[in-house]
Amino acid sequence: MRTWKALTPLLKLLVLTQLAFNVGFYAVLPFLAAHLGTAIGMAGWVVGLVLGLRTFSQQGLFVVGGWFVDRYGVRPAVLTGCALRVVGFAWLGYADETWTVIGAVLLVGLAAALFSPAVESEVARQAVLWEEDGHGPRTRVLALFSASGQAGAFMGPLLGALLLTVDFRTTCLAGATVFVLVLAGHARLMPHRIPGRVATRARGGVRVLLRNRPFLSLCCAYGAYLLAYNQLYLALPQEVQRATGSQAALSWLFALASLLAVCGQLPVTRWAGDRLGLRRSIAVGLLLVAAGFAVVAAARPAAWTGAAGLLPATGYVLLLTLGQMLIVPATRAWVPDLTEDGRLGLYTGALSSVSGLIVLIGSSAGGCLLDLGLPPAVPWLVLAALPVLAVALLPHRAEGAGCEGDTALPR
């Protein structure tokens, strides 16, 4: 793979780190709800609370983790985050009461709030430098980074399901072991000082961020995409249940999405890099996502069931995944061009926190929409309208290094 061979040792470390992060995470978390409900006997609302607290402690605190990265550097953030994840997973494996489970999942979420902004912001910064050295568009690096994460998300549940034949504690300890290995690898290989990265001591970064309209517009558009993506876990299960009478086909649809993302991310990004800039890549991706919802909306009045009933859902998953492959690398590539000098970590964290808040609010509204008893096509048409409206939110300004030949200053 030409892109991989051209990467610097630091970029290779960061890409492999994303793979390991997701293997360790997805080996445990997909099985948490079932463990809490069956093995521990928690009520459904308590399980929901626990899962919500984990999401909040991660997405909600990304902006804090980004500030930590800008102030203290990538290495301390990654090492601290990995150490917290090891403790959190080990604790979760032995937790058997509500308060201990909550403490463990808060640590698990806080860990990601530290190491994810560190890795994501440094990958974006290094991708800009890689581009400026003449290796090609930065989106190729970020596409490889996204594909590695998807590969980890695909392999993690397989590892977890295998270990779950022993028990949940073994699965948690295996997840902790993955992060021990990541911790050891970064302690040995991550530079103490990364050339070009300067710690930011000045205050006022959040105030400047809140006045950065192009960046906030991008956050809102990205939040609309994430809200649409979240329908994989909200609207899609209902559609599969309606069409087949069970949710057994969901696992196959999720596997299809993961395999498509792993195998197609780099070719799609290379195609988009030759033809589209950053804004147009995101816009086309959002329109593909909208088309996925529209496919289901068009088919719902026919009320197909069985294998035929799964065809619209499959089309939705395929179009959503294609949109994702355009949106995610382009968004990450655009952030450095909208960022104040020395604040890339803060802005990377804010992208996740702001969009996560949009998903939190929008998911509740989406759930109500699906429960209102409207004509079957209406909820899907409303969901299709959201990505279309998000296109109008995309900033109208110079795209920087979106395509070959463009330039941008590293941050």
Where do the PLM segments sit?
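Juxtamembrane intracellular "pre-TM" segments in multi-pass secondary transporters
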Residues: 1-8, 187-221
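C-terminal transmembrane helical hairpin of 12-TM major facilitator-type secondary transporters
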Residues: 279-328
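Conserved MFS/SLC helix-loop-helix module at the cytosolic interface between two early adjacent transmembrane helices
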Residues: 59-96
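Helix-loop boundary and gating motifs at the non-cytosolic
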Residues: 2-55, 214-255
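Helix-to-loop junctions at the C-terminal end of transmembrane segments
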Residues: 61-73, 263-278, 370
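A late C-terminal transmembrane helix in Major Facilitator Superfamily
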Residues: 338, 342-373
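Cytoplasmic helix-loop-helix junction between adjacent transmembrane helices
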Residues: 104-149
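A membrane-interface helix-boundary motif in multi-pass transporters
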Residues: 164-177, 368-387
